[in-house]
């Protein structure tokens, strides 16, 4: 590590619980949901002059509903950050939250920023239906799209050239192309659930969660303080599920990530401002890389992104102690592991559960990976962590962190 380069440090990180689709967090507006971890960061670090924040980068994939007017800045204002602190919403679909963390670190490393907030928010429960304007007057053929996930307003040329497979279809494509067995997918799903339930019981996940209080019209407020998606299951139960793309398919609701709600925020600083405001650096952001892949097999994106960030940082997979691989689907997660020469059950991967168990609120997930990775590094004494994700329309993203 060169002493001449400004370093970017993660000094704090916190998230909401991840709620099920239509679950406890579904009554909270997206911009209000995004404000919750920001408010928690401010409360946990009262000594910070929040007017010194250079920018707020928040990931968000939808932007068709209550997140439509730059939700990063709306959430910042709702959280009580000074009005002169700007904010920008990043949209790299599923990788948005991780991109926000990496981009904030880049701003600090460049010397243009000293104190940054990064994170992401997504309320998939509250994703609206949208419709285009009619092509002709008095048309009765207007389509209506559900913006929860996947394609809408499809470009015919895109469809002709690359196809517009749904997310489960891309996972089925990966399973076919890379010969990922149904049983292996179910094993990964079961392991994710078991690890998440164990992490909840051990209190590991509680370290990164701020409780959300939801007032009720009648009776006491509801307090949500843990993820709603983890559940007990078995190989027998998973094996009974039908394929979501076709009845004999391998991708099921049980071995795919959830449709969820949640938000997450991280505080990043250079060494000077961390010292000035009494912040304790927890991890250094070593590097970030992105990669493009064919949209029909978007799930393999983490493999080339990981190889790029390893080459960029001069590290090898053998030096990585903690791996947070976003489990969009077990099929793509297993394909990535095998492409990287790792075992299906590598103990470094998702030790506290992955997205199959914890959920995948698109724009928030990457920030959650970074948050969990930092906590796992400190819990295990490891040095380096890799966070990596696949991205719809054919991309991958990877970030490497170093424990401080």
Feature names for model-found ranges:
Residues 28, 60-115, 148-151, 161-167, ...:
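Conserved catalytic cysteine-centered active-site region
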Residues 115-173:
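Flexible glycine-/small-residue-enriched beta->alpha junction loops
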Residues 2-28, 149, 234-300, 304, ...:
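Condensing-enzyme catalytic core mediating Claisen C-C bond formation in acyl metabolism
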Residues 2-75, 79, 170-182, 192, ...:
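Conserved active-site "lid/cap" helical segment
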Residues 90-122, 175-204, 265-272, 337-338, ...:
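Active-site-proximal alpha-helical scaffold in enzymes
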Residues 15-16, 27-36, 47, 184-276, ...:
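N-terminal extracellular/periplasmic Venus flytrap/periplasmic-binding protein-like
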Residues 172, 208, 216, 286-357:
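Active-site pocket-lining segment
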């Amino acid at each position: 590590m060169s002493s001449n380069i400004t370093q970017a440090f993660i000094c704090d990180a916190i998230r909401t619980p991840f709620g099920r689709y239509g679950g406890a967090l579904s009554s909270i507006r997206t911009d209000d949901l995004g404000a919750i971890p920001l408010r928690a960061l401010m409360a946990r670090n009262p000594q910070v002059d929040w007017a010194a924040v250079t920018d707020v980068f928040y990931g968000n994939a939808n932007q068709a509903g209550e997140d439509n007017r730059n939700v990063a800045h709306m959430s910042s204002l709702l959280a009580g950050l000074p009005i002169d602190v700007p904010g920008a919403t990043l949209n790299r679909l599923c990788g948005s939250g991780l991109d926000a963390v990496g981009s904030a670190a880049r701003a600090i490393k460049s010397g243009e920023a000293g104190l940054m907030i990064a994170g992401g928010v997504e309320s998939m429960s509250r994703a609206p239906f949208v419709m285009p304007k009619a092509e002709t007057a008095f048309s009765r053929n207007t389509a209506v799209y559900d913006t929860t996930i996947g394609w809408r307003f499809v470009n015919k040329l895109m469809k002709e050239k690359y196809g517009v497979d749904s997310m489960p279809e891309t996972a089925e494509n990966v399973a076919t192309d890379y010969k990922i067995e149904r049983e292996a997918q179910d094993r990964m799903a079961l392991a994710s659930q078991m690890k998440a339930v164990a992490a909840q019981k051990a209190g590991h996940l509680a370290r990164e969660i701020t409780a959300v209080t939801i007032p009720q019209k009648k009776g006491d407020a509801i307090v949500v303080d843990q993820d709603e998606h983890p559940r007990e299951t078995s190989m027998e139960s998973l094996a009974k599920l039908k394929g979501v793309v076709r009845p004999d398919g391998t991708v099921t609701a049980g071995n795919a990530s959830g449709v969820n709600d949640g938000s997450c925020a991280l505080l990043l600083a250079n060494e000077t401002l961390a010292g000035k405001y009494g912040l304790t650096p927890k991890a250094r952001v070593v590097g970030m890389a992105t990669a493009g892949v064919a949209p029909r097999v978007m799930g393999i994106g983490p493999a080339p992104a990981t190889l790029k960030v390893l080459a960029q940082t001069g590290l090898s997979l053998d030096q990585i102690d903690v791996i947070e691989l976003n489990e969009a689907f077990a099929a793509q997660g297993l394909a990535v592991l095998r492409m990287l020469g790792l075992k299906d059950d590598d103990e470094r991967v998702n030790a506290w559960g992955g997205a199959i168990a914890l959920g995948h609120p698109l724009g928030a997930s990457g920030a959650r990976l970074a948050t969990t990775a930092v906590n796992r590094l400190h819990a295990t004494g490891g040095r380096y962590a890799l966070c990596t994700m696949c991205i719809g329309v054919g991309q991958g993203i990877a970030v490497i962190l170093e424990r401080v």
